[in-house]
A protein has these predicted regions:
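Short Gly/Pro-enriched turn/cap motifs at secondary-structure boundaries
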Residues: 68, 131-133, 181-183
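Active-site loop ensemble at the mouth of alpha/beta enzyme cores that anchors a bound cofactor
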Residues: 95-175
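Active-site loop/helix belt of alpha/beta enzymes
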Residues: 3-126
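Short alpha-helix capping/helix-loop boundary micro-motifs
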Residues: 187-196
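Loop/turn positions that initiate beta-strands
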Residues: 200-203
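Gly/Ser/Thr-rich active-site loops/lids in small-molecule metabolic enzymes
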Residues: 68-71, 172-176
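Short, basic/aromatic beta-hairpin or loop at an interaction surface
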Residues: 173-188
Length: 207
């Protein structure tokens, strides 16, 4: 029969785990995991994974390895000592060319999800001219003006997207920059506010 290779998510006591992504095996559970996997003849433990292994530090303006990465590397060693052949060490988050350069310090890493690296939209790209050129935009238009603030249509807002500014206008030559007023975290993103009034129907470009 076909043997399915598995990549196990591993977690440590001090790892950063985002809400909604709670899952994985603690390091002290790996021996039991290996023993139980021996009863399943069509699977093979062949990889380890955790998220996020790298994050952008807005103070230092640099991408830094997280405790999660060290958990992954410890898990690889433990599983290999238990007889597993670990072929894939996946270390995702904030992946871009710059992060790949940092990964050279950890030769055990074999993969990382491309994610925002493809589109040049990691937090690193906000402060640096990196190899990737930002290629995703949020396009809307001014829906109304109230109390000297323009509002643009929302929908699909990624709350960790760090939107700060928008370009507003009806032509490329006439675009003006304005600050974005984001909805509260517990609100639906029907609209984004702008600091200043603008013409209803003008385009709004955000990134």
């Amino acid at each position: 029969g076909l043997v399915q290779k598995e990549c196990e998510r591993v977690i440590g006591e001090n790892d950063r785990i985002y809400s909604g992504q709670t899952a994985g095996f603690y390091l002290n559970q790996l021996e039991e995991l290996v023993q139980k996997s021996k009863d399943l003849k069509y699977i093979e433990i062949a990889g380890v994974d955790n998220f996020p292994c790298f994050l952008y530090d807005e103070v230092t303006k640099e991408i830094q390895a997280q405790e999660n990465l060290h958990t992954v590397l410890k898990a690889k060693k433990i599983l290999e000592e238990l007889g597993c052949f670990i072929q894939n060490v996946n270390a995702p988050s904030a992946t871009c060319v710059h992060t790949l350069e940092l990964m050279k310090q950890y030769p055990e890493i074999t993969s990382a999800e491309p994610g925002h690296g493809f589109s040049g939209t990691t937090p690193y790209h906000v402060d640096h001219d990196a190899e990737e050129i930002p290629s995703v935009l949020y396009l809307s238009e001014v829906s109304h003006v109230l109390d000297n603030h323009a509002y643009i249509y929302g929908g699909g807002y990624y709350r960790r997207g760090h939107i700060q500014n928008a370009l507003i206008g009806s032509s490329y030559e006439g675009l003006v920059k304005d600050s974005v007023i984001l909805p509260d975290m517990d609100s639906i993103d029907y609209h984004f506010g702008l600091e200043n009034p603008h013409h209803i129907g003008d385009s709004a470009v955000l990134c």
